Amino acid sequence: MVINENLNLMDKLKILTDAAKYDVACTSSGVERRGDGTGMGNSIAAGICHSFSGDGRCISLLKILYTNECVFDCHYCINRRSNDVERASFTPEEICQLTMEFYRRNYIEGLFLSSGVKHSPDETMEELCRTAELLRNQYHFQGYIHMLSLIHI
């Protein structure tokens, strides 16, 4: 597994939103609004998906992975250890900053956060919880958060 430590935030965003599209727990409506490259508004490249709230509203979510690194080699998973893909990881702070910037621009109403298992399920889960805690308590984010719970059987 090759890990590039010199990625900037946009590189990480591209890699980790692209890898998140394989998590079918939140699939988009199928609408593809591509930008022409001259301005803002290309939600396809930004990892925006759509889901429905309890009251039936369609809401936009930033769908990203915390990391696509994984210690496991599950054959069904795109992030499996033996798969030759570019690896990247966010920090909790980076995810919070991205979420808030997307929210302030009214691109999203919430965050869909999933992850590979970086070192251990417990350690990765602690980082995911730290991210949610920062969003709620430091950034005062009141939007929707859907977060994967990692277990190892």
Positions of PLM-derived features:
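Conserved glycine-rich "GG(E/T)P / GGGxP" loop and the immediately following alpha-helix
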Residues: 111-130
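Flexible, acidic/Gly-rich N-terminal and inter-domain linker regions that tether
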Residues: 1-69
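Canonical Radical SAM [4Fe-4S] cluster-binding loop centered on the CxxxCxxC motif
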Residues: 64-93
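Conserved small/polar residues in nucleotide/adenosyl-binding loops
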Residues: 151-153
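Short, charged beta->alpha transition segments
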Residues: 63-64, 93-104
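Alpha-helix-loop-beta-strand connector modules within alpha/beta enzyme cores
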Residues: 126-144
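Short Fe-S-cluster ligation motifs
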Residues: 101-114
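Hydrophobic faces of well-ordered beta-strands that scaffold small-molecule active sites
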Residues: 60-62, 111, 143-147
